[in-house]
């Protein structure tokens, strides 16, 4: 698996750390959102996602919950099929791990 960063249409940059059929229970990716950028509304079918914030400051929106500010050490739980997006509200890159269970598959992704 390539560990090179790539841009996704959602509006952020992704580096896949672990996403193989050898470990179908989970995938781990590093996500980077530049300052001032909001990712597109999207959801993952039959996949629970967790954001583990590593660096920067963001505002995360999950389903019908009130938007909340997140920073290093915060964990965001995103249930399956729940709409989500995140905004970088800081002056530096917002960096977080996106941990999916089961592992991320393109066919589970839907932009809204």
Residue ranges and their predicted role:
Residues 1-26, 40, 108-112:
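A short, N-terminal "cap"/entry segment at the start of jelly-roll beta-barrel domains
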Residues 16, 29-45:
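Conserved short histidine dyad/triad with adjacent acidic residue
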Residues 22, 80-106:
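Ligand-binding loop in jelly-roll beta-barrel domains
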Residues 37, 46-47, 66, 82-83, ...:
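A generic "binding-loop/recognition-motif" signal
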Residues 46-48, 52-58, 63:
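Glycine- and acidic-residue-biased ligand/ion/polar-headgroup-sensing regions
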Residues 65-80:
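Short acidic-glycine-tyrosine-enriched beta hairpin
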